[in-house]
Amino acid sequence: MNVTIISVGKIKEKYLSDAIIEYSKRISRYSKLDIIEVADEKTPENPSDVEKSKILEKEAERILKYLKKDSFLITLEILGKELTSEDLAKKINDLSISGKSDITFVIGGSLGLSKNISEISDFKLSFSKMTFPHQLMRVILLEQIYRSFRIISGEPYHK
């Protein structure tokens, strides 16, 4: 299994970088993992709808450069489908069994994702109806991917 995470924006906080490094190491026992950071656009305070749209489109162009044609695309979206950890593990396992050996997760920037990216998504995943900082979302996603591989492998995990 190959897992790619495309994320808008850089991680600036050391504690988040440390967590990302740790979960990346743990996941490497089960899967090849690539994390791709694309630059975020500077967002003015109180942007207009037109400004928001332009920002999302610029970020989408950067994301599109890294999407692989045969990868199963999962976008993280507040209006996506909420899954339990077991459901996510099943989804990943089912994809593997059906011959999909490549999964790409996309995390948008502070304004979310462009419709252009959302529309080509194979699956829209939501972790919560709440909003999280996109930098923290990367850590949460990595932890859930790691947990999924442990569940798939029949290994113990914290419930």
From Swiss-Prot:
MF terms (GO), sorted A to Z: rRNA (pseudouridine-N3-)-methyltransferase activity
Reactions catalysed: pseudouridine(1915) in 23S rRNA + S-adenosyl-L-methionine = N(3)-methylpseudouridine(1915) in 23S rRNA + S-adenosyl-L-homocysteine + H(+)
Keyword presence, S-adenosyl-L-methionine: yes
EC number: 2.1.1.177
GO CC annotations, alphabetized: cytoplasm
Primary localisation category: cytoplasm
Alphabetized UniProt keyword annotations: Cytoplasm, Methyltransferase, rRNA processing, S-adenosyl-L-methionine, Transferase
Enzyme class: transferase
Residues that span the membrane, as ranges: none
Subcellular location: Cytoplasm
Keyword flag Cytoplasm: yes
Function: Specifically methylates the pseudouridine at position 1915 (m3Psi1915) in 23S rRNA.
InterPro entries: Alpha/beta_knot_MTases, RlmH-like, tRNA_m1G_MTases_N
Source organism of the structure: Methanococcus maripaludis (strain DSM 14266 / JCM 13030 / NBRC 101832 / S2 / LL)
Protein name per its UniProtKB record: Putative ribosomal RNA large subunit methyltransferase H
Superkingdom in the source lineage: Archaea
Residue positions binding S-adenosyl-L-methionine: L76, G108, F127, S128, K129, M130, T131, F132
Family the entry assigns: Belongs to the RNA methyltransferase RlmH family.
